[in-house]
């Protein structure tokens, strides 16, 4: 289900004024980019720009063609009196692969090796351009799955989940391993950590996730899969469903106790003695379609 805009809710200098077509195209483009997955009625545009529907339709056709050509996204048209246009962020396959290849090369760095078979990712996940690419890739793959919320576990997965949620224009929820008094009442579950085989706890505020939600799980790293299994169990406790699970990086040298997930980068070899690490592209590019 899409959000909708009947009346433009952000005032800018020049609102409801007659603009030149070039100015109108720029302003319209920005409004679409600012409101992904949101139905904007043609009446909103005709009122805002004091232009005929035929002129607005021509403008939208120009933007639609350019967005698709440049790999920005697609514009869907909803017919009828209550119809309008919806901007859906998408990425071209070649753009996604090029971004992932750059990340893969940065992952092939032995200095990223941490004790216990973990990989240092914090520097990458602090870069806005990396988050932009990851967020758009994942959101593009799930744009037609009617996602209601993006879920991650504190703390390293938060930047990716927030970026994905921004592109999908849905809330993101943070699962914690220890409760905060500011969260109010919570729902908690026990799960088996795949990496340590210990029973651990995760919890989520009752007010965070409405019953019946379709949830996309996003995380930074997968070693054995216990965390993803735990989040799936927690989603069930909210009478909701898991639409999918995506991780930025997975360790292919560990035994996984989880299925039905995709990864953007996969570590296929770790040798702490010789300080060697090998990364390849994950199955994300096999299991998902792009623009």
Where are these regions (language model features)?
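Key DNA-contact positions within bacterial/archaeal DNA-binding proteins
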Residues: 53-55
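PRPP-dependent phosphoribosyltransferase catalytic core
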Residues: 233-291
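Active-site-facing substrate-recognition patch
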Residues: 82, 86-146
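The alpha-helix within a helix-turn-helix
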Residues: 45-46
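Residue-level detection of the helix-turn-helix DNA-binding "recognition helix"
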Residues: 57-68
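The short coil/loop that forms the "turn" connecting the two helices of the helix-turn-helix
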Residues: 50-51, 170
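Short, glycine/charge-rich flexible loops or terminal/linker lids adjacent to PRPP-binding catalytic cores
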Residues: 170-215
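Extreme N-terminal segment that seeds HTH/winged-HTH DNA-binding domains in transcriptional regulators
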Residues: 2-41
């Amino acid at each position: 289900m899409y959000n909708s805009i009947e009346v433009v809710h952000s005032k800018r200098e020049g609102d409801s004024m007659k603009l030149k077509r070039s100015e109108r195209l720029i302003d319209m483009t920005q409004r679409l980019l600012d409101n992904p997955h949101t139905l904007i009625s043609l009446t909103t545009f005709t009122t805002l720009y004091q232009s005929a529907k035929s002129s607005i339709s021509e403008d939208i056709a120009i933007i639609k063609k350019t967005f698709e050509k440049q790999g920005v996204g697609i514009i869907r048209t909803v017919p009828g009196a209550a119809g309008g246009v919806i901007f859906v962020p998408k990425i071209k396959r070649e753009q996604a692969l090029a971004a992932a290849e750059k990340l893969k090369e940065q992952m092939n760095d032995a200095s990223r090796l941490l004790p216990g078979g973990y990989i240092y990712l914090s520097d990458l996940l602090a870069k806005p351009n990396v988050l932009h690419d990851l967020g758009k890739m994942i959101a593009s793959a799930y744009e037609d799955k009617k996602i209601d919320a993006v879920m991650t576990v504190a703390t390293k997965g938060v930047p990716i989940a927030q970026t994905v949620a921004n592109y999908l224009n849905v809330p993101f929820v943070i699962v914690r391993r220890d409760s905060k008094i500011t969260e109010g009442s919570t729902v908690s579950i026990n799960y088996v950590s795949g990496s340590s085989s210990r029973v651990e706890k995760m919890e989520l505020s009752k007010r965070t996730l409405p019953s019946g939600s379709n949830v996309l799980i996003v995380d930074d790293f997968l070693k054995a899969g216990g965390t993803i299994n735990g989040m799936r169990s927690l989603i069930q406790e909210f009478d909701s469903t898991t639409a999918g699970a995506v991780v930025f990086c997975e360790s292919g040298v560990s035994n996984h106790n989880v299925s039905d997930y995709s990864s953007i980068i996969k570590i296929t070899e770790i040798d702490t003695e010789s300080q060697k690490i090998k990364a390849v592209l994950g199955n994300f590019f096999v299991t998902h379609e792009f623009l």
